[in-house]
Amino acid sequence: MPIALKEWAVTVRALAEGEQLITLRKGGIREPEKHFKLDHDRFFLYPTFDHQRNDLVRESHQPELRRALEEGVWNDGEPSVTAFRVEGGIQQPERVRIRAWAEVAGHFTISDPRCVDALSPFYVWTPDYAEKRLEWKRRHPLHVLLLRTYRIPRPVTVKVKDEYGVCSSWLELQRELPFEGTPVLSDGEFERAAEEIEGITREASQPLGQPVLV
């Protein structure tokens, strides 16, 4: 069965629109080894809502919070705008739409908050929230995944299962999905951005996987 990486719905949407190129990981409290481990080099992007908050998304992408609701299907209708204000304000829907997958083009670890700030053009969270990801589990470095994202030809709706709610990075989807589709950025656009990201992380990290520039 295909593997998916769990990420906020607004982040999944940004990745699928080419507005975000990286994700930052420390790992959930239910990770098998208690911290993040990159076990897969390509995976589908699974949207989550229950920890997503509007005050942790930068001002320029606030409108995307409402549009990100399209990634879920609620039997009782979409949640209200006020639900975005607190963590847990939006429950995970009955079903979610899988519309993109990603391959890892680079994997770095960093511990310098200045590097997190320098990477801010490549994510939609507030810089303060990104730094909080660094500070959590302080003894462990922050994993920076450079992702080449692809939109699948037609979004696929999958049923949300109880085991998907465990606080961990990965899940196994219970239906087959195609690793097909179009990259959200052209080869040239992605290569230029990847070179900039690699340059930012070079002095602050040791690359765990060399970027694959295509």
Q: Language-model features: where?
A:
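Structured alpha/beta reader/binder surfaces that contact nucleic acids or chromatin modification marks
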Residues: 1-214
